[in-house]
Amino acid sequence: MPPSTGSVPPAASTPAAGDEATAAGRVLLGRYELGGLLGRGASAKVYLARDLLTGRDVAIKSFPNPRHGGGLRGGEEDVLLRPAPIEREAAILPRLRHRHVMRLREILATRKKVHFVLDLAAGGELFSLLDASGRMTEDLARHYFRQLISAVRYCHSRGVYHRDIKPENLLLDDAGDLKVADFGLGAVADGALHHTLCGTPAYVAPEILSRKGYNPAKVDIWSCGVVLFVLAAGYLPFNDASLVNMYRKIYAGKFRCPAWFSPELRCLVRRILDPNPATRIDTEEIITHPWFRQDASHFAMAQLMQHGHDEEAKFKTEFKEDDMARDMTAFDILACSPGSDLSGLFGAEPGKERVFVGEPAAAVLSRVEEAGKKEGYMVTREGKKGTGPVYVKGENGGIVAKVCVFKIADAVSVVEVVKGYGAEAARFWKARLEPAMKPPAAI
């Protein structure tokens, strides 16, 4: 049987006075009614909650606010010395919008707590689907492995690496689809090899053990291979009562496939659990492997692996002025509040620029449209009251930028620019969009 996923059943909790994140029935910041405790980790607790505005059940992950000196693992000194899970997830989750990645809906904060509002994994853990023998059929394992690789491939395309893929972090929504959760050990691409010792022992890649630096994409692929093996075999590929011996097996890539594995599955597992990261298969090779593509039409595979609609979903969220006001309260106004200083914790949101202007929205958006058309891009304006958003799309249909203007006061508006990914979007911002934020007399 696979190892226990360590889930924690709902439990009663005796809150400290004034701690709204620990008492069932309390309402968090006027919107979320807290329910039972779903689980806890080294740095956070997760609660069931109900959104009083929509009636939707959500999960709320609550952390001590480091700015209040709440301490994460070892106290305030440790928080200052290394990025805490809250900082990692706050940097990573806003980048991600994919059907198989747990969605961050909102970040809220009080003086003592920071709360992530997440989709609820109503279907429980992936490993709850294992049969009496402790494993899945090969077809069912393939179904969920496809969803896992779709999520991992997407994250890597966004420069995000999980580094702790394991059963506890593979959840199911109410439709039974996979959701990859918990990016507390995640990393963002910086062009360098990583040296941090991350991961869970049985799922850790051999190059991490060498402490010589590693490619986090290949580390994630290795962990996906261990998950696939466990789903189809019902036990770990590298297991030993002695942790040292288990590490030796991992480092040597020493394992045996069970007799019921098909030849194609054996081949794929051996390519993934290759102890040499240089020759280990990557996600592009995985999605073309015969076992992975078996019984799937070209169209179905393209639908599973395409990122375009996810990027569109991320950028084409319905924006209303009152929604923007609520978002700015959570991320900006609150961050500047003396009582809840989060500015040093979250920093700038990745890929997003905000510029304050003293002119009507229509004038700014007209300059944005002109800048896009000068580059030969497709430009469309949506929304009401001339506030946009304006979408600027490149030759391949990918979004280069989304620009929206929100009125703050009679003579003040804020222009929010969400930049696309890659060098093209960065160049367009610097060469065209940033200058377009200034009125003509100031250019």
Swiss-Prot record:
InterPro entries given for it?
Kinase-like_dom_sf (IPR011009), NAF/FISL_domain (IPR018451), NAF_dom (IPR004041), Prot_kinase_dom (IPR000719), Protein_kinase_ATP_BS (IPR017441), Ser/Thr_kinase_AS (IPR008271)
Give its E.C. classification number. Answer: 2.7.11.1
Induction note: By drought and salt stresses and abscisic acid (ABA).
PPI, as annotated region: 350-379
Q: Which reaction does it catalyse?
A: L-seryl-[protein] + ATP = O-phospho-L-seryl-[protein] + ADP + H(+); L-threonyl-[protein] + ATP = O-phospho-L-threonyl-[protein] + ADP + H(+)
The molecular function terms in GO held by this entry are: ATP binding; protein serine kinase activity; protein serine/threonine kinase activity
Q: Where is this region: Activation loop?
A: 182-207
Q: Name one Pfam family in it.
A: Pkinase
Q: Where is the active site?
A: 164 (proton acceptor)
Cofactors needed by this protein, per the record, are: Mn(2+)
Per UniProt, the keywords (alphabetical) are: ATP-binding, Kinase, Manganese, Nucleotide-binding, Serine/threonine-protein kinase, Transferase
Biological role: CIPK serine-threonine protein kinases interact with CBL proteins. Binding of a CBL protein to the regulatory NAF domain of CIPK protein lead to the activation of the kinase in a calcium-dependent manner.
Name of the featured protein: CBL-interacting protein kinase 29
